[in-house]
């Protein structure tokens, strides 16, 4: 909404100077005010939003061909991008640049490789953090290096199967997030479900810092948080695991997680980030039910079966056998000794008991009913 107001101010400023202004939608497949229910109200559930609202509406425009000629606007302004000093004075971002190549050309190349290799098993493969069945195009999409129209039609032209349909439905979730933000401008700070305003969140700075640093003692959580810190990105499966752990096992307000992701993600997107955190907390639109609490141990066993993801980001656990990799606190001492692991020293003890904290969360959420 604030961007709409900004654009209106720019248009008004230029109109006063007899400059014709035209604006075009290049960030979304559908404008958020276009997709609404028959009674004119916004959708609150994704499936009807996407299937009835989006897919029954005018199809998104196909990508335009590259212009053969650009008419350069002549201006007396002489500032360059470097003059704006957008980069930090202390170049902490250099380590992130090992994981990303900026620009449209690389985005197009990444998308082509995804269509050739990743999309064939996208529906199932996208759940495995160590595999490469996701496009990892979200930063390029966020910064406008690719448009959602290019992704939509690029996938559609690749053929028709359940994997392509599922990929397009994920773009639909992005549209749903923007619809929520458009209709709820305070999405990043205010519960969509007002009953959560009285939820008994716990303020625990020590646990919050441990979560941010990937030092919770729960390997699947720590791997996700370290991936975020080291690369500026986190696999979506991991986002759900670390989010559930924060708001349900630790009972820390979802807004703390939203702010941390906003500060650290290369693809930090106000609509997606806010809606995603409200979804995992259970207070958003079409949210996960309160009793859905991700068990990071079983999630690791199922979606990182060979332990590659955890071992990549938690090298201190590299020698721990798979049986105990996701729950090292259950390993016999001789197993930990052989793996050069000493809990509390080389790797933290868990900051919460998963079973006890789960029961505590269920009790807290039930109090809202």
Predicted stretch roles:
Residues 1-61, 163, 226, 272, ...:
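Trp/Phe/Arg-rich N-terminal binding region typifying the photolyase-homology
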Residues 4, 10, 19, 28, ...:
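Weak global preference for isoleucine
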Residues 6, 28, 34-37, 50, ...:
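Short, isolated positions within intrinsically disordered regulatory regions of eukaryotic proteins
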Residues 9-10, 30-35, 56, 98, ...:
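Intrinsically disordered, low-complexity boundary segments flanking structured domains
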Residues 11-13, 77, 87, 103-106, ...:
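Generic detector of short, locally flexible boundary/turn motifs and exposed helical patches
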Residues 28-31, 90, 98, 199, ...:
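Short, low-complexity intrinsically disordered segments
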Residues 41-195, 304, 308-369:
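Glycine/tryptophan-enriched, flexible segments
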Residues 128, 132-322:
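Active-site-proximal binding-pocket segments
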């Amino acid at each position: 909404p604030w961007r709409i107001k900004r654009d209106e101010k720019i248009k008004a400023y230029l109109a006063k100077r007899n400059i014709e202004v035209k604006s075009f939608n290049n960030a979304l497949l559908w404008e958020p005010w276009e997709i609404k229910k028959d009674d004119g109200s916004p959708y609150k559930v994704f499936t009807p939003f996407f299937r009835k609202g989006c897919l029954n509406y005018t199809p998104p425009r196909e990508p335009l061909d590259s212009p053969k000629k650009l008419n350069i606007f002549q201006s007396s302004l002489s500032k360059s991008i470097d003059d704006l000093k957008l980069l930090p004075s202390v170049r902490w971002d250099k380590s992130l640049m090992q994981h990303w190549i900026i620009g449209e050309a690389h985005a197009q190349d990444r998308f082509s490789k995804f269509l050739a290799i990743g999309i064939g098993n996208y529906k199932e493969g996208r759940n495995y953090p160590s595999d490469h069945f996701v496009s990892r195009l979200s930063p390029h999409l966020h910064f406008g290096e690719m448009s959602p129209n290019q992704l939509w039609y690029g996938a559609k032209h690749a053929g028709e199967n359940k994997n392509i349909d599922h990929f397009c439905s994920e773009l639909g979730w992005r549209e749903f997030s923007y619809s929520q933000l458009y209709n709820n401008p305070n999405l990043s700070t205010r519960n969509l479900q007002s009953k959560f305003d009285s939820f008994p969140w716990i303020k625990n700075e020590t646990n919050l810092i441990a979560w941010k640093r990937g030092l919770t003692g729960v390997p699947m959580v720590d791997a996700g948080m370290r991936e975020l810190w080291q690369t500026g990105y986190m696999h979506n499966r991991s986002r759900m695991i670390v989010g559930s752990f924060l708001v349900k096992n630790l009972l820390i307000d979802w807004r703390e997680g939203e702010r941390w992701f906003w500060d650290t993600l290369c693809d930090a997107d106000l609509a997606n980030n806010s809606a995603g955190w409200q979804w995992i907390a259970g207070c958003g639109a079409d949210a996960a039910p309160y009793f859905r609490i991700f068990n990071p141990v079983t999630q690791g066993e199922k979606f990182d079966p060979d332990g590659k993801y955890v071992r990549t980001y938690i090298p201190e656990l590299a020698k721990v056998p798979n049986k105990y990799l996701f729950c090292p606190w259950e390993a016999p001492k001789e197993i930990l000794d052989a793996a050069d692991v000493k809990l509390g020293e080389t790797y933290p003890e868990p900051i919460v008991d998963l079973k006890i904290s789960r029961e505590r969360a269920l009790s807290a959420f039930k109090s809202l009913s």
